Amino acid sequence: MNRLQAKKAVNVSRHEQKRIRYKLTPEEVKAERKERKRRAAIQRAEKKLIRAKGEALVAFQAVSNPSCNFLVIDFEAYEFNQKIITEAGITMRINGEWDYHHYRIKNFLHLRNGRFVPDEADNFQFGDSKIVTKIAFISILKKILKTPNLHLVGHGVENEIKYANVLGIPIPKDVTVLDTQNVFSFFQSLFLKEISNSNNISLAKMLTHLNIRAFCLHNAGNDARYTSEALREMTNKFTLSNF
């Protein structure tokens, strides 16, 4: 018997010893293993919920504080090359006033989605789209990121930060980052009485849960606007007693 065979024999022997010790059938051992996995999944969900609660509290306090500024951002990338940013949606609250913007990158107007992702580039619902060069947009976003007391919000915000990095735009360390997926996870546990093992709910599904009618999603400007609406809808229902 070689070492590998001996190791396998020891493992089988230990498994058999446990089964015999507790007089468990193979089916009971399988059920026990399944139950352990279920409990572990619940523990992971509860840990995520604790983090989501903290993020929801920050969002609640910031939205209710007029001195807090917001940048809600969404990028659309070319479906055949995720390093090519074709659109950007920017919703801002600066000095208490909300503004909604949709930028299309002039360098890539000829690149259209539509095979895997809906092509809604022409369908901004909250104003006129602005066509700018990539360099001009980078300058615009960098300037916004210098706003004091700024909170950066995104739905799946890590993806938006990744796209910003693709453009060569780092997020300043003094900017507070909020993810509406996490805020919704806490909102869901509180008001919908559901605890999800995943925070990865789509924007469309979250808006449906919040009874927000949305049109032409996958237009970056619309997505940023609806993300801001979702954030406000959720935080408006929170009270300090929820935390």
From Swiss-Prot:
GO MF, one example: nucleic acid binding
InterPro entries per UniProt: Gfd2/YDR514C-like, Gfd2/YDR514C-like_C, RNaseH-like_sf, RNaseH_sf
Keyword terms: Nucleus
Chief subcellular location: nucleus
Keyword Nucleus in annotation: yes
A GO cellular component entry from the record: nucleus
Name of protein: Uncharacterized nucleolar protein C2C4.08
Organism: Schizosaccharomyces pombe (strain 972 / ATCC 24843) (Fission yeast)
